[in-house]
Amino acid sequence: MNQTLLSSFGTSIERVEHALDALREGRGVMVLDDEHRENEGDMIFAAENMTVEQMALTIRHGSGIVCLCINEERRKQLDLPMMVENNTSAFGTGFTVTIEAAHGVTTGVSAADRLTTVRAAIADGAKPSDLHRPGHVFPLRAQAGGVLTRGGHTEATLDLVTLAGFKPAGVLCELTNDDGTMARAPECVTFARLHNMPVVTIEDLVEYRQAHERKAS
């Protein structure tokens, strides 16, 4: 990753700390992966405190595929089958079947409806019957171990929200340009500055977790 592009956001460790502070303050974070992987930036939010306005921003500027990152425990709690038995996607992204809140939504497409679905899915006592399938929210099952196991946006989202003190549930969506092409690092940085989001890379998060786990041991 071009460190010159990122230097204004601090050092690698500082970028993670700024991201955690932003989540605690109810703001979003721009997460970049490796230029040789997907080479994209995802807007991420803690599912617990995401607002309708943030969901609308995500839909307006994102790919339209709004994803709810969850762990295996939550997937089992909601009885969500994986989308396919044999995952042949390039990076093994852990899509489950799509979901919609069983109550409180109309078509399920609006920002308010998608946020209602997210809240239904992450509620402490959520049951499978609280959700209809299919729907307009795409759950993603993160790998245990987070970014130290898989360097994906799904794992980065759960690592960041849990390190920030939230339950393991976050919303992500890939940033796109106005012409429909994928936003790359320079466009992601410009967007993040415009919308008061810190920028962090998955590589930063790996370094941060490794450093903290070394201290703990």
From Swiss-Prot:
GO terms for molecular function: 3,4-dihydroxy-2-butanone-4-phosphate synthase activity; magnesium ion binding; manganese ion binding. The keyword Magnesium applies. Mg(2+) 2 binds at residues 38, 153. Pathway: Cofactor biosynthesis; riboflavin biosynthesis; 2-hydroxy-3-oxobutyl phosphate from D-ribulose 5-phosphate: step 1/1. InterPro entries: DHBP_synth_RibB-like_a/b_dom, DHBP_synthase_RibB. Its cofactor is Mg(2+); Mn(2+). Keywords: Lyase, Magnesium, Manganese, Metal-binding, Riboflavin biosynthesis. It catalyses: D-ribulose 5-phosphate = (2S)-2-hydroxy-3-oxobutyl phosphate + formate + H(+). Binds 2 divalent metal cations per subunit. Magnesium or manganese. GO terms for biological process: riboflavin biosynthetic process. Mg(2+) 1 binds at residue 38. The keyword Metal-binding applies. Homodimer. Belongs to the DHBP synthase family. HAMAP family: RibB. This is 3,4-dihydroxy-2-butanone 4-phosphate synthase. It comes from Enterobacter sp. (strain 638). The lineage of its organism: Bacteria, Pseudomonadati, Pseudomonadota, Gammaproteobacteria, Enterobacterales. The gene is ribB.
